[in-house]
């Protein structure tokens, strides 16, 4: 089974279930092998860091942890609503290009 995720880095998404339900954020990282995404401001965890050249004193840092990709839904840039993603082919010169579209308003997302 292919390791595909329906969102890309830089997309604005909304969390649809769990502790952070309803929270919006930008996708920082996509982990297709794990089927997870890291969303800005969602699933903040504290991590203990040993002293190293980057952080000589060590300590506790807060950072975003990955969540399952199935728990987020893309927000359409035009209608500003959470939406499913459709695909369409558009003609670009002599070749066809596959683009993502909003299922609610039909607008091309990327």
From Swiss-Prot:
The keyword rRNA-binding applies. It comes from the Bacteria. GO terms for biological process: translation. PROSITE patterns: RIBOSOMAL_L24. SMART domains: KOW (SM00739). One of two assembly initiator proteins, it binds directly to the 5'-end of the 23S rRNA, where it nucleates assembly of the 50S subunit. One of the proteins that surrounds the polypeptide exit tunnel on the outside of the subunit. Part of the 50S ribosomal subunit. Belongs to the universal ribosomal protein uL24 family. This is Large ribosomal subunit protein uL24. It comes from Caldicellulosiruptor saccharolyticus (strain ATCC 43494 / DSM 8903 / Tp8T 6331).
């Amino acid at each position: 089974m292919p390791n595909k995720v329906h969102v890309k880095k830089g997309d604005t998404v909304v969390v649809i279930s769990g502790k952070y339900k309803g929270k919006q954020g930008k996708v920082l990282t996509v982990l297709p092998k794990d089927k997870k995404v890291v969303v800005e401001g969602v699933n903040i965890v504290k991590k203990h860091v040993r002293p190293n050249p980057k952080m000589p004193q060590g300590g506790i840092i807060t950072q975003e942890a990955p969540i399952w990709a199935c728990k987020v839904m893309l927000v359409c840039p035009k209608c500003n609503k959470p939406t499913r993603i459709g695909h369409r082919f558009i003609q670009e010169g002599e070749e066809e290009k596959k683009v993502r579209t909003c299922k609610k308003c039909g607008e091309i997302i990327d």
